[in-house]
């Protein structure tokens, strides 16, 4: 007989209570129709001596996991674009999972015309998530992002230069689950003297990333658990998002930030895990 720990016992009990709450009329309405539309703007300052003085004050915006489909419409996407432009980011980063299911989604031709309205003077970058490869979506996603003015980082590096020749580097890895990530081949080029950011959809790859001189890893995939229980945390965590679920973590010299994303998948609810757009302000220190 399998031994059940106290934590697992409590988790099962709380899951049952949460299920009862969500299936009640009030809980169901809140988790399905209210919280999923409460977009939280989280703002953080990134401090490092490696951040050039000329980059001081620059704003980097991360958004993730839209999962366009039944629970996230083009109208929702338009509102997100307006909210992004309202904060005037310098660099915009999308960390994967644009469309929930490419095989069933019928509005694919209209996505780029909305996404391309995102304004960022120092460029827009994107990486693949697992849903972007799934459902034969690989080529569709590439086309949409390029038409939207995003540079797709596929096991590659992009250096952001300013006129004084100062720079930071942004690396992008292919999706770990369904893509062809080349971690060593990509990150071995990271320089110790440069502030290095890596975009990778799945956060739990962070221990491998920490072996390289990467300062910041930005990920999504987890949805912050999408449904959380007080004192016990997330109860819905996908593969490679079980150790690092939301917010900041430190792994050796690496700082990891996991964005909760904006959409929903698998279940139509968000509870205690509001959709998130993150703004990082760079600070030389």
What is each of the regions a protein language model found here?
Residues 57-67, 167-175, 197-200, 255-260:
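Active-site-proximal beta-strand elements of phosphoester/diester hydrolases
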Residues 48-60, 158-170, 250-255:
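Beta-strand-turn-beta hairpins that frame and shape the catalytic cleft
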Residues 1-20:
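N-terminal secretory signal peptides and thylakoid transit peptides that target proteins
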Residues 42-45, 110-182, 188, 244:
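Extended active-site neighborhood of metal-dependent phosphoesterases/phosphodiesterases
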Residues 23-59, 71-75, 79-82:
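C-terminal segment of N-terminal export signals and the immediately downstream linker at the start
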Residues 63-64, 92-96, 124-129, 153, ...:
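Active-site neighborhood of phospho(di)ester-bond hydrolases with catalytic His/Asp-centered motifs
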Residues 203-279:
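Conserved beta-sheet core of the metallophosphoesterase superfamily
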């Amino acid at each position: 007989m399998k031994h059940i720990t106290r934590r697992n016992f409590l988790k099962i009990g709380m899951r049952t209570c949460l299920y009862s709450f969500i299936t009640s009329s009030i809980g169901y309405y809140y988790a399905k129709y209210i919280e999923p539309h409460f977009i939280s703007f989280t703002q953080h300052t990134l401090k490092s001596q490696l951040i050039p003085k000329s980059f001081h004050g620059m704003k980097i915006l991360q958004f993730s996991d839209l999962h366009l489909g039944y629970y996230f419409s083009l109208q929702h996407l338009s509102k997100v674009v307006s909210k992004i432009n309202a904060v005037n980011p310098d660099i915009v980063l999308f960390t994967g999972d644009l469309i929930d299911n490419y095989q069933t989604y019928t509005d694919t031709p209209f996505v780029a015309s909305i996404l391309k309205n995102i304004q960022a003077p120092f460029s827009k970058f994107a990486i693949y998530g697992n849903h972007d490869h799934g459902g034969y979506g690989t080529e569709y996603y590439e086309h949409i992002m390029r038409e939207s003015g995003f540079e797709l980082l596929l096991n590659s590096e992009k250096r952001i230069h300013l006129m004084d020749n100062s720079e930071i580097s942004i690396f992008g890895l292919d999706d770990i689950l369904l893509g062809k990530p080349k971690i060593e081949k990509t990150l071995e080029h990271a320089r110790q003297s440069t502030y290095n950011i890596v975009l990778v959809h799945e956060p739990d790859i962070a221990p491998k990333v920490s072996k390289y001189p990467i300062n910041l890893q930005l990920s999504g995939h987890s949805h912050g658990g999408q449904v959380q229980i007080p004192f016990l945390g997330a109860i819905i965590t996908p593969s490679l998002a079980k150790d690092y679920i939301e917010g900041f973590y430190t792994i050796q010299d690496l700082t990891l930030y996991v964005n909760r994303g904006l959409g929903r998948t698998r279940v139509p609810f968000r509870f205690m895990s509001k959709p998130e757009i993150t703004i990082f302000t760079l600070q030389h220190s």
